[in-house]
């Protein structure tokens, strides 16, 4: 079984979670999210993530039930479950969004996972990329070897499937993210469409693909930000950038596997560019999907949105029912024993 911190152990029973959710409402981290620390052989360090289990998960009546999983990315593992991540949230988290949708019947029970893909300080992003020059930040806690793609695919996803009652199949697994988290969710789904059936992004900080996806736009303030030096190298290893950029992966990947993923890419409006919206970057990626005759399955622009956590949570309120619809058939088939579980093969990959 996974090793929880003390406060998570206290909340092991779902009913107890609800009581604590009221009693500890003043704490910044949503107490319904459990922090788990695992020893990563890939990163060579201990790495944390949060998980939110559905109501009734611990009850005897549901002991044989398995659940679909949605991974939510930003950078630090706490961001999606931090009530005060910015002032726009007004004390709520994405778990409140999920619970409201569940009560309304717009989604079914699912497991939410919040991976940590940055340094402990959140100053160095990991981007779900295997770092080109990890030695540049050797002393930054939380990075280790910097092999974040391998950590997620080879360790974290199998860990979740082996320690929780998931439906360990791509048809019951999705990803979503905000800002750099949107880069990560679309990147990992385009790179590994065999693992995910649904991928969303709100205001993703995407890079620009050139030359039919073989190159990247070099004059880009995002690409040239020094915080990406360990990830992409200095000077930039443009081949490494292209191999890990969502836009390039969509432009050059196999059409059939990409078309088998539900894409849910959204952004703020053009009027909020350049500092409060990534409208142009999102439109670039959506356009590349369209060039492959692959549909973006959601309204692409939130007309009044800006780049903050209130709108990130609103994005999940829009996309979570669509993620659920993509996974619902797999949930039914798992209940009847039709779907084949694949976690063992993933864990040994």
Q: Where in this protein do the model-derived segments appear?
A:
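Non-catalytic cap/lid and distal C-terminal segments of serine-dependent acyl enzymes
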Residues: 2-349
């Amino acid at each position: 079984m996974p090793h929880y911190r003390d406060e998570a152990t206290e909340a092991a029973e779902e009913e107890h979670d609800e009581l604590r959710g009221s009693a500890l409402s003043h704490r910044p981290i949503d107490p319904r999210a459990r922090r788990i620390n695992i020893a990563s052989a890939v990163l060579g360090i201990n790495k944390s993530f949060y998980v939110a289990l559905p109501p009734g998960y611990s009850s005897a009546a549901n002991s044989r039930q398995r659940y679909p999983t949605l991974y939510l990315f930003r950078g630090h593992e706490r961001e999606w479950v931090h009530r005060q991540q910015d002032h726009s949230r007004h004390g709520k988290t994405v778990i409140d969004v999920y619970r409201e949708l569940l009560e309304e019947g717009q989604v079914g029970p699912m497991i939410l996972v919040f991976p940590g893909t940055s340094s402990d300080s959140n100053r160095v992003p990991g981007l779900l990329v295997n770092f080109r020059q990890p030695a540049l930040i050797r002393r930054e806690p939380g990075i280790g070897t910097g092999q974040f793609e391998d950590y997620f695919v080879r360790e974290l996803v199998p860990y979740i499937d082996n320690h929780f009652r998931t439906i360990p199949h791509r048809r019951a697994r999705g990803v979503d993210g905000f800002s750099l988290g949107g880069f990560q969710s679309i990147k990992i789904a385009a790179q590994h469409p065999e693992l995910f059936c649904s991928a969303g992004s709100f205001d993703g900080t995407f890079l620009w693909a050139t030359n039919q996806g073989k190159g990247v736009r070099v004059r880009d303030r995002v690409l040239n930000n020094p915080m990406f030096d360990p990830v992409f190298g200095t000077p930039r290893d443009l081949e490494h950038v292209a191999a890990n950029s969502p836009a390039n992966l969509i432009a050059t990947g196999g059409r059939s596997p990409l078309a088998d993923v539900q894409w849910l890419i959204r952004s703020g409006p053009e009027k909020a560019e350049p500092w409060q919206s990534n409208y142009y970057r999102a439109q670039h990626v959506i356009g590349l999907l369209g060039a492959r005759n692959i549909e973006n399955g959601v309204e692409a622009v939130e007309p009044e949105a800006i780049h903050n956590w209130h709108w990130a949570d609103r994005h999940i309120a829009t996309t979570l029912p669509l993620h659920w619809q993509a996974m619902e058939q797999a949930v039914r088939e798992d209940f009847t024993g039709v779907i084949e579980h694949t976690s063992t093969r993933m864990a040994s990959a």
